[in-house]
């Protein structure tokens, strides 16, 4: 990290007059920002100045900007230019030799990169203790420090920053560089508001942990990186999404977890939790970043086109073109956090396109919405609203609109206090009806004050009869779904003052005759009509027609209103006005309500009742309730018992006497006994009172129980006598156990298999009273009765079970489980079945809630004990109970994480694991699922390990390998072992010691579906410690990995495992890889075939570990100088991804460096022209690497020409003593290259490669050794001139790097990649011992 962790100082401090004096540090502190001066003393101590490095003579180190595990970052001043830079010091002690050389090579390449959104690498200087990387200085620190000091970022600012980050990231990806460590601390800012990516490429290598463990902090890491599948450009996109969450929330995802649990969650979860308050655009952006499959993750180029990023750039383009300045960014962050902390709902700025005042106005608008208006008169606006939601007009004959068809005011219909019982306040009196029937259409003024209401629709101009006003719209019989559409014309007509009389209204056609059930509602109102006799005649004739068809004045129902009016083409428009007026003359039903019960002289005929054939009753729908009585009456009449014959002497009870049996004396006695019994039981029940003496209550309860046992039919007597409540009242206060026992038996007998009585008992509060007797303080007999009651509650109906649980029944069930199985087996089994029934309940309550309640009582501990006892028994019942216990365990493993943590007790797990082998196969698989689900939570892994889960599961896997259910068992076991061993070396070694390796190898060879579960465990074994690798050696693990190279899905993982193993035990692994005594394909052939047949994604991913492996082991690299490999590499040299082209060039370079012909291989295998084309590649790093290969080829050709003309070459006259060679760190003169290269300490150019005829013992002595300190097996006969303490370095690295980097310690001059001026002195090369070797 190059940033200042907690300061915002402006500009570099003025240089001290005397370099190296403490005054400079004090002055820099005085010139720092107030934010820094307010820091406590402890922080200022941390930011101490660096110890002067003699090799950094052109720089003066200042205060510390940040510290990490491998070093610190200091601000420094360049004495020559006055430029302020950042110097990252890395301790060499913490770096492996191979990593140091890689870093120095990479820095020399990365310093060529230049983009406004990445931090510039300026070079490096190597000292005896540290490697000093010189970087561009960003004065305003990182986004992490801004968030730490000022709070969370608003979305628009995050979008603006992410736009710049994506531009920098896109540039790096186009250059073939993977950042690997994107987070807020590695995104630095400048005063101009620019953000720059830091710590990409090389610097990220220095933040990792040793022993091939997971690199860096886990919270930003992609799942494929955690699983050691290799980092790609898609891994940076995942980290970018985590950085967005970090800036929005102030913390990265899973920040509340420890690193290892966080790694576990990243791999297992579908995606990290998204911020709750994020906008949909941000959530969509994050979901694009968090695609689990790296192949489906979008690229940086596509993310730049995301709407959120585009809008952020567009909003920024409104202001001047330059980026957001630092002060403005800080101000916006402060305002945003103040808004988050403020109690009111208003916002400081207008969010997107929402109304800025909307949030503030909503609380004020809310009360007015529910405030009732003081004036009940409908306003013009309210009339439109109410009309829109009016009920559809009734279309029966009993139509109120027909009664008001002339001049009634619609506003009167809206009055809530008018009731039909009082004729609507007099509006429907006979006087009013006379006025409605008059021709002038005027309305008499009401005495009740109804004339105060204005009626804008009472007098509407129109073309039709002036007597008509508002009419109901005639509906077609289409059903209820068209009701709203049928009422629209009427409403529209009222709004536009257009009469609706043009709509044809057909005559009424009732569905059924009702003349038998009502008085004739047609009366003569001729005295009400003034002068028009013709109209009266027409009205009367119309009523006559209607009466002939029958009319219906039944109470209208909503389901019939729409179908009353039926359109008929037989009636034209001319008949409609008269029909309207005729209908309106009728009296409303409310006016004759009382008269319908009066007899009608014409209704003396009872033929309809007697069921005469000539009269057909059309039973109305509303009379369905009288079906039984009507049918019974007709059946009686059909028997002619009293009406069919007029003879008065006939006995009306003749039929009754015929049906009587003979007098049965025994039946009479039984009835008498039952009557006496009923009286006795009712007397006993009435005596059950809490005020009775306990002795009396005891006698009563015993008598009642005796009677009930002798005659179970007395159950109904007790219920009818309301005996349940007295029994519950006595049970609530009684303490005599004999009374309690008797009453409990009575209750259980009454409620047995009768869910209605059970529900009634629950409703009156019987459950908590009886549950009390399940406690252990009561004797066994009482507890058994209480248990029988509990059993009835949970197995009869869902409702009783729900009420049982709500009354605290779960605690009762747990208490049953805790009893001794030997003594109280029935109680224990009732508890097991009860808990199973609770989980089997299909109700609205989530099972997770039951799990949480039961986990507080540690229910799985007694359940595991019960499981052990049940497995000792045989029979169907034992198997059922075993299955139910296994299902209960499985349900607990599906609950929330808190429940899993509570149930993952060591004693429970140990007991369950021990009983696994004894369980039946089906239930065994269920219990294995329970263990697997627990293993998916990182906090339970220690408990599983302490319960010997790995040992037990491995043994179970071995014992079931030949059984029919092996596939299901191994599926669960392998998942569990994988979850436990992943990212944990101790558990990996534990599994290896228990013999998991040969089992997994056998599964991989035989079981294809299980191969996907076994291979991850096997490949992770190479990353474990010495114990795991020893088991791999014992089971030919290296040969197994080589065989995996032929699998396109696992070749990348296998090659990464081989490379990791080679790092840990270099000499031994290298020897086996070079040995071709294996019967199968050699390692080199496997790699060549892998590169030849691999698909696009696999080919890209395999290049990274392959180039690392070849760079680490030159002897292995030398075996790859094959024409078939170079042909394949040449086909891919023009790949569209820069990272692929760069890795291919690195592989070719490693092979050339390790071979005798070196750069000559390019011309030999026809790659020279293709690499010459790459010298013009758009990617800077590719161009630079191609140029170095071309120069290597030129040097090789030049050397071969010199070798053909030995007379032209002068032999060396002096040699370098071995002691001097072992201690030097740099040549005495800056220039170290021979063929007119730029004279620099280290500029990444290829040093001269010296051909060697073979890998001699002295060459092997220079190769890197293992991390465990073992040397190569071929180094026994080394010459004494090499020195025993000399570090083993690879020959390829020795050829590629200058002599500056060959030795670990330097005392004379530092190695550096910084450019220096050419020396004006004559260039002379110091002769070396190697020169004398090959020159002679």
From Swiss-Prot:
Record field: compositional bias (Low complexity): 1-10, 1253-1264, 1272-1285
GO molecular function: ATP binding; metal ion binding; protein serine kinase activity; protein serine/threonine kinase activity
Domain Protein kinase: 59-309
Cofactor: Mg(2+)
Annotated binding of ATP, by residue: 65-73, 88
Reactions catalysed, as given in the entry: L-seryl-[protein] + ATP = O-phospho-L-seryl-[protein] + ADP + H(+); L-threonyl-[protein] + ATP = O-phospho-L-threonyl-[protein] + ADP + H(+)
Domain of life the protein comes from: Eukaryota
GO BP annotations listed: cell division
Disordered as annotated region, ranges: 1-46, 368-402, 1194-1336
Polar residues compositional bias, start-end: 1213-1236
Residue ranges with Basic and acidic residues bias: 36-46, 384-393, 1194-1205
Active site residues per record: 181 (proton acceptor)
Chain segments annotated as coiled-coil in the UniProt record: 654-682
Function: Required for early events during cytokinesis including localization of cytoskeletal components to the cytokinetic ring.
Name of protein: Cytokinesis protein sepH
Organismal lineage: Eukaryota, Fungi, Dikarya, Ascomycota, Pezizomycotina
Gene name as annotated: sepH
């Amino acid at each position: 990290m190059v940033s200042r962790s907690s300061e915002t100082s402006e500009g570099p401090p003025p240089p001290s007059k005397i370099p190296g004096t403490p005054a400079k540090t004090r002055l820099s502190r005085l010139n720092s920002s107030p934010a820094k001066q307010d820091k406590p003393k402890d922080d200022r101590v941390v930011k101490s100045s660096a110890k002067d490095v003699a090799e950094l003579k052109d720089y003066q180190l200042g205060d510390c900007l940040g510290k990490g595990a491998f070093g610190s970052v200091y601000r420094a001043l360049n004495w020559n230019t006055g430029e302020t830079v950042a110097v990252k010091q890395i301790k060499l002690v913490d770096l492996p030799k191979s990593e140091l050389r890689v870093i120095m090579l990479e820095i020399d390449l990365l310093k060529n990169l230049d983009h406004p959104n990445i931090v510039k690498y300026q070079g490096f200087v190597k000292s005896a203790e540290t490697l000093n990387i010189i970087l561009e200085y960003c004065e305003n620190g990182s986004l992490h420090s801004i968030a730490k000091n000022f709070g969370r970022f608003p979305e628009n600012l995050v979008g603006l920053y992410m736009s710049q980050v994506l531009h920098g990231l896109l540039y790096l990806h186009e250059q073939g560089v993977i950042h690997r460590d994107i987070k807020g601390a590695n995104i630095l800012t400048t005063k101009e508001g620019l953000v720059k990516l830091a710590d990409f490429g090389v610097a990220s290598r220095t933040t990792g942990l040793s022993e091939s463990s997971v690199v860096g902090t886990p919270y930003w890491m992609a799942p494929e990186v955690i699983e050691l599948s290799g980092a790609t450009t898609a891994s940076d996109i995942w980290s970018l999404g985590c950085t967005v969450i970090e800036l929005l929330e102030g913390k990265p995802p899973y920040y509340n977890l420890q690193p290892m649990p966080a790694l576990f969650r990243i791999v297992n979860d579908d995606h990290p939790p998204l911020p709750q308050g994020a906008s949909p655009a941000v959530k969509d952006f994050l979901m694009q970043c968090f695609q689990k499959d790296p192949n489906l993750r979008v690229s940086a180029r596509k993310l730049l086109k995301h709407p959120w990023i585009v809008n952020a750039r567009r909003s920024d383009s409104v202001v001047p073109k330059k980026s957001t300045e630092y002060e403005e960014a800080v101000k916006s962050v402060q305002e945003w956090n103040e808004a988050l902390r403020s109690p009111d709902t208003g916002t400081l700025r207008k969010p997107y396109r929402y109304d800025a005042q909307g949030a503030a106005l909503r609380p004020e608008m809310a009360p007015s919405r529910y405030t009732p208006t003081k004036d009940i008169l409908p306003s013009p606006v309210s009339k439109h609203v109410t009309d829109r939601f009016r009920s559809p007009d009734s279309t029966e004959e009993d139509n109120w609109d027909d009664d008001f068809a002339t001049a009634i005011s619609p506003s009167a219909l809206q009055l809530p206090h008018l009731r039909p019982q009082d004729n609507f306040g007099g509006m429907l009196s006979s006087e009013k009806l006379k006025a409605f029937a008059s021709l002038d259409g005027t309305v008499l003024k009401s005495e009740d004050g109804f004339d105060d209401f204005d009626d804008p629709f009472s007098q509407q101009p129109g073309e039709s009869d002036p007597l008509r006003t508002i009419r109901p719209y005639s509906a077609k019989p289409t059903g209820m779904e068209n009701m709203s559409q049928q009422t629209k014309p009427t409403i529209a007509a009222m709004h536009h003052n257009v009469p609706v009389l043009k709509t044809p209204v057909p005559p009424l056609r009732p569905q059924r005759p009702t003349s038998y059930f009502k008085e004739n509602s047609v009366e003569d109102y001729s005295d009400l009509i003034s002068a028009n006799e013709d109209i009266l005649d027409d009205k009367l004739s119309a009523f006559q027609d209607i009466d002939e068809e029958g009319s219906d004045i039944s109470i209208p129902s909503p389901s019939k209103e729409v179908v009353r009016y039926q359109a008929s083409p037989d009636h034209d428009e001319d008949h409609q006005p008269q029909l309207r007026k005729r209908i309106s003359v009728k009296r409303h039903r409310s006016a004759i309500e009382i008269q319908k019960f009066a007899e009608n002289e014409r209704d003396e005929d009872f033929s309809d009742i007697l069921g005469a054939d000539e009269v057909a009753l059309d039973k109305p729908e509303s009379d369905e309730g009288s079906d039984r009585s009507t049918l019974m009456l007709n059946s009686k009449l059909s028997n002619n018992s009293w009406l069919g014959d007029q003879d008065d002497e006939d006995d009306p009870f003749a039929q009754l006497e015929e049906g009587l049996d003979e007098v049965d004396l025994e039946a009479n006695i039984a009835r008498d006994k039952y009557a006496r019994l009923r009286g006795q039981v009712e007397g006993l029940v009435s005596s059950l009172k809490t005020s009775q003496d306990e002795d009396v209550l005891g006698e009563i309860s015993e008598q009642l129980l005796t009677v009930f046992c002798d005659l179970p039919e007395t159950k109904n007597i007790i219920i009818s006598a309301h005996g349940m409540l007295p029994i519950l009242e006595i049970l609530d206060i009684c303490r005599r156990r004999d009374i309690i026992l008797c009453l409990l038996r009575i209750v259980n007998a009454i409620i047995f298999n009768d869910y209605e009585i059970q529900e009634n008992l629950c409703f009156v509060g019987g459950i908590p009273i009886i549950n009390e007797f399940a406690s252990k303080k009561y004797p066994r007999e009482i507890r058994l009765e209480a248990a029988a009651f509990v059993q009835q509650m949970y197995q009869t109906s869902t409702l009783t079970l729900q009420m049982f649980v709500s009354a605290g029944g779960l605690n009762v069930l747990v208490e049953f489980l805790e009893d001794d199985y030997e003594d109280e087996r029935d109680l224990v089994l009732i508890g097991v079945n009860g808990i199973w029934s609770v989980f089997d309940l299909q109700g609205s309550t989530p099972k997770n809630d039951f799990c949480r309640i039961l986990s507080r009582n540690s229910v799985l501990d007694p359940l595991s004990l019960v499981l052990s006892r049940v497995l000792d028994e045989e029979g169907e019942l034992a198997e059922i109970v075993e299955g139910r216990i296994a299902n209960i365990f499985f349900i607990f493993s599906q609950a929330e994480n808190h429940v899993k943590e509570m149930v993952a007790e060591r004693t429970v797990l140990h007991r369950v694991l021990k009983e696994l082998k004894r369980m039946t196969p089906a239930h065994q698989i269920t219990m294995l699922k329970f263990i697997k689900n627990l293993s998916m939570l990182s906090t339970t892994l220690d408990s599983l390990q302490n319960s010997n889960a790995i040992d037990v599961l491995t043994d179970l896997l071995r014992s079931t390998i030949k059984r029919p259910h092996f596939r299901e068992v191994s599926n669960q076991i392998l998942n569990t072992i994988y979850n436990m061993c992943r990212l944990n070396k101790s558990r990996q070694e534990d599994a290896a010691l228990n013999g998991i390796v040969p089992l997994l190898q056998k599964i991989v060879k035989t079981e294809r579906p299980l191969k996907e579960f076994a291979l991850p465990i096997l490949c992770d074994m190479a990353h474990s410690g010495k114990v795991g690798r020893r088991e791999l050696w014992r089971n030919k693990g290296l040969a197994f990995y080589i065989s995996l190279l032929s699998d396109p899905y696992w070749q990348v993982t296998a090659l990464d495992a081989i490379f990791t193993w080679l790092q840990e035990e270099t000499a031994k692994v290298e020897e086996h890889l070079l040995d071709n005594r294996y019967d199968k394909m050699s390692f080199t052939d496997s790699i060549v075939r892998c590169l030849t047949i691999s698909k696009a994604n696999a080919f890209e991913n395999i290049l990274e570990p392959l180039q690392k492996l070849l760079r680490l082991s030159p002897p292995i690299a030398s075996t790859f100088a094959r024409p078939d490999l170079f042909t394949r590499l040449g086909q891919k040299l023009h790949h569209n991804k820069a990272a692929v082209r760069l890795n291919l060039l690195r592989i070719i370079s490693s092979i050339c460096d390790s071979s005798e012909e070196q750069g000559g291989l390019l011309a030999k295998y026809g790659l020279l022209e293709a690499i010459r084309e790459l010298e013009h590649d758009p990617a800077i790093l590719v161009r630079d690497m191609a140029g170095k290969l071309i120069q290597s080829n030129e040097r090789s050709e030049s050397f071969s020409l010199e070798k053909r003309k030995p007379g032209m070459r002068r032999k060396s006259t002096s040699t370098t003593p071995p002691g001097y060679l072992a201690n030097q760190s740099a040549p005495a003169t800056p220039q170290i290259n021979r063929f007119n290269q730029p004279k620099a300490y280290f500029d990444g150019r290829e040093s001269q490669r010296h051909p060697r005829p073979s890998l001699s013992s002295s060459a092997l002595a220079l190769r890197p050794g293992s991390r465990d300190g073992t040397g190569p097996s071929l180094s026994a006969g080394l010459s004494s001139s090499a020195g025993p303490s000399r570090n083993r370095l690879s020959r390829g690295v020795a050829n590629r790097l200058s002599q500056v980097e060959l030795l670990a310690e330097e005392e004379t001059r530092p190695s550096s990649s910084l450019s220096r001026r050419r020396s004006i002195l004559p260039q002379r090369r110091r002769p070396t011992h190697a020169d004398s070797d090959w020159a002679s």
